[in-house]
Amino acid sequence: MTELRIYATRGAGVEADRDSAVAAAPEALLSTSNAEQISAQLKTRGIKFQRWPSKPKLEQGAMQEQILEAYASLIASVQKNEGYQTVDVMRVERDQISGSTLRQTFRQEHQHAEDEVRFFVEGCGLFALHIKDEVLQVICEANDWIAIPAGTRHWFDMGVDPNYCVIRFFKNSGGWAASFTHDPIADHYPGLDQARKQTTQG
């Protein structure tokens, strides 16, 4: 389930132990799974969010060419309106050797010199956006499109058992490049698995 949670950064705690740090995270100021509310809340903070129509004819595990063809008109519209020059497909699967390394890298707070724009074709992931004195956690699932402006402090968690596929949009043909803040803030907030568990329990 797609969900947005908004936390205040103050009072998150500074414990070194990961479990106690997560437990010390503040209560969410807002929690919603309503797509319109999610879009509206993110928009006020400069984040773009949309739900794209599903492509029922696209099989699970489809190749890059099939995915790009299925979403060609929507991709072209985004490129025309936003100026993104390069588009590719990234798939991370459970048995992928580099999965744990990628998770460790993406979970560190970082920034980009250009927008981070993703459309979820399959699976899910958690974007955490550190904006002023707030942390906004967005669980994105299939058919979610999100655009995070350049310079926004954020991190991404794919979970302990990753399995997702996204379309990535870039203005720079060089692809993904990050500047890490070395702020351990991500340790003080739930990761994807705990966030989804909390959603189920709620």
Curated annotation (Swiss-Prot):
Binding site for Fe(2+): 110, 112, 116, 154
Enzyme class, UniProt record, top EC level: oxidoreductase
Annotated site residue numbers, May play a role in metal incorporation in vivo: 109
CC cofactor: Fe(2+); Ni(2+)
Important to generate the dianion (site feature) positions: 118
Gene Ontology MF annotations: acireductone dioxygenase (Ni2+-requiring) activity; acireductone dioxygenase [iron(II)-requiring] activity; iron ion binding; nickel cation binding
Gene3D superfamilies in UniProt: Jelly Rolls (2.60.120.10)
Record-marked site positions (May play a role in transmitting local conformational changes): 115
Co-factor note (free text): Binds 1 Fe(2+) cation per monomer. Binds 1 nickel ion per monomer.
Pathway: Amino-acid biosynthesis; L-methionine biosynthesis via salvage pathway; L-methionine from S-methyl-5-thio-alpha-D-ribose 1-phosphate: step 5/6
Keywords: Amino-acid biosynthesis, Dioxygenase, Iron, Metal-binding, Methionine biosynthesis, Nickel, Oxidoreductase
GO biological process terms held by the UniProt record: L-methionine salvage from methylthioadenosine; L-methionine salvage from S-adenosylmethionine
Reaction equations catalysed: 1,2-dihydroxy-5-(methylsulfanyl)pent-1-en-3-one + O2 = 3-(methylsulfanyl)propanoate + CO + formate + 2 H(+); 1,2-dihydroxy-5-(methylsulfanyl)pent-1-en-3-one + O2 = 4-methylsulfanyl-2-oxobutanoate + formate + 2 H(+)
Disulfide bonds: none
Binding residue positions for Ni(2+): 110, 112, 116, 154
Record EC number: 1.13.11.54, 1.13.11.53
Family statement: Belongs to the acireductone dioxygenase (ARD) family.
PANTHER family given in the database record: ACIREDUCTONE DIOXYGENASE (PTHR23418:SF0)
Assembly notes: Monomer.
Function: Catalyzes 2 different reactions between oxygen and the acireductone 1,2-dihydroxy-3-keto-5-methylthiopentene (DHK-MTPene) depending upon the metal bound in the active site. Fe-containing acireductone dioxygenase (Fe-ARD) produces formate and 2-keto-4-methylthiobutyrate (KMTB), the alpha-ketoacid precursor of methionine in the methionine recycle pathway. Ni-containing acireductone dioxygenase (Ni-ARD) produces methylthiopropionate, carbon monoxide and formate, and does not lie on the methionine recycle pathway.
Name by which UniProt lists this protein: Acireductone dioxygenase
Species the sequence originates in: Synechococcus sp. (strain CC9311)
Source organism phylogeny: Bacteria, Bacillati, Cyanobacteriota, Cyanophyceae, Synechococcales
